[in-house]
Amino acid sequence: SNAGFNGKTSRQATDLAIAEFDHLSAGDAPFYLWVQYFDPHVNYIPDADAPFQGSLQKDLYYQDVWQTDRELGRLFRHLEMSGFFEQGNLVLTADHGELLGERGAYGHAFWLDEEVLRVPMLIRSPLLPAAEVDLRVSTVDLLATLTELTTGKSLVTDGRSLLPIAR
């Protein structure tokens, strides 16, 4: 199931995700829920209550990141209250970073700088211990990782399972 994107704000994406999660989790079948937050993308249109002020691109970006973080917190609290984390797996990552004036560059489409390539990847599962791992991995590894995490089986792909690192 898919919630977010298509012009939805972070608040709207979270509302959709919570409603869809509640619907899917009421059944007995395993499910996959994809939530995409699009606020921290050009054109930056922050909420009026964002704590950062200013009109520069970097200020507007940080305001959008703040409101997305706020909405992720709301979603995670809902998941926590539902008991999801006792049995469910959660992955949080990003498609790319952003240059905000570093070395005079803006955007992400034409550069391979650290600010563009380095994105967060969080995997939370009742099957894994809490840990922080500072290694270069790739989002291409997610398919093999999630397959092994949910089925116990290895999958031959371009990526590799990250479970040996996480355990």
Descriptions of predicted regions:
Residues 1-167:
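Catalytic domains that recognize anionic headgroups
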